[in-house]
Amino acid sequence: MAAIKDSLLAQVAEVLPSSGHKVTIVGIGQVGMASAFSILAQNVSKEVCLIDVCADKLQGELMDLQHGSNFLKNPQITASTDFAASANSRLCIVTAGVRQKEGESRLSLVQRNTDILKNIIPKLVEYSPDTILLMVSNPVDIMTYVAWKLSGLPKNRVIGSGTNLDSSRFRFLMSQRLGVAPTSCHGWIIGEHGDSSVPVWSGVNIAGVRLRELNPILGTGEDPEKWNELHKQVVDSAYEVIKLKGYTSWAIGLSTASLASAILRNTSSVAAVSTSVLGEHGIDKDVFLSLPCVLNANGVTSVVKQILTPTEVEQLQKSANIMSDVQAGLKF
């Protein structure tokens, strides 16, 4: 007696092994799963592969997502502890690493997470030599540099999530002060995703109206409205969320999905992501920091030439020097 499938379906062609938009996510902690869920829920990719060393948790997360396939437009979701499962990925997102502790600087994580990447990056590139790497593991700027060194890929195809989230936090806080939607608030945080990040106060605007034209001391210590507190809130916000709930997840997951969308959909959107900044704004260090970049199917194809004030340039160069000093102590 023929199997039901054979009686039901008459095959006329082979099923293609991949959609061509496969995304692999390495690390199924809070950030990895928030990224996976955001990518699936927003239909950024129909093919997601999860990679982790914890087999039981991996299987549980896989089943939990698969059981919701009916509500996610029928994606193909797989999972494995074997990197071979990541083969032919268009985009590899790395969230694996030691979690940041309450009050711990992202930079203090650096060597522990560097050691973890040594076992991840070469394997991803082995199975997907044409992939784009999107680094999310902290400290993300250093980890993006490490991933580039370990991968052998061109710099445009090794990207860090960088200050995309910081800029989103900045715009949200602006929106709360002004009563305007965050998407209508235009402001950028550049440099390090962390304590030495740089708010570009000179460019903050609503509908093209620069706030510094209304208040020339916006963002300075002399400003009676204390707008400079917004940047401090941006820097402190991750620490505050970690203190309250133990980790950050949803915002960084949504940020990651947004970057994945720009790459997979070839949109040439501009986002603040970590990229090589050697030669930008007078930086003479080979480091990765965030600047507004054009993102598409070839990764970072352009860096926006932001017009910065001398103070902002100085702060950005200081951020680069901090990264360079940390990199000098890395052991590969």
From Swiss-Prot:
Pfam families (alphabetical): Ldh_1_C (PF02866), Ldh_1_N (PF00056)
Active site: H193 (proton acceptor)
Pathway info: Fermentation; pyruvate fermentation to lactate; (S)-lactate from pyruvate: step 1/1
InterPro entries: L-lactate/malate_DH (IPR001557), L-lactate_DH (IPR011304), L-lactate_DH_AS (IPR018177), Lactate/malate_DH_C (IPR022383), Lactate/malate_DH_N (IPR001236), Lactate_DH/Glyco_Ohase_4_C (IPR015955), NAD(P)-bd_dom_sf (IPR036291)
Record keywords, A-Z: Cytoplasm, NAD, Oxidoreductase
Catalysed conversion reaction: (S)-lactate + NAD(+) = pyruvate + NADH + H(+)
GO biological process annotation, one example: glycolytic process
Residues passing through the membrane, by range: none
Binding site for NAD(+): 29-57, 99, 138
GO cellular component entries: cytosol; mitochondrion
Residues where substrate binds: R106, N138, R169, T248
EC number: 1.1.1.27
Enzyme class, UniProt record, top EC level: oxidoreductase
Gene Ontology terms, MF aspect: alpha-ketoglutarate reductase activity; L-lactate dehydrogenase activity
Quaternary state and interactors: Homotetramer.
Stated family: Belongs to the LDH/MDH superfamily. LDH family.
HAMAP family (UniProt xref): Lactate_dehydrog (MF_00488)
Protein name: L-lactate dehydrogenase
Origin species: Drosophila melanogaster (Fruit fly)
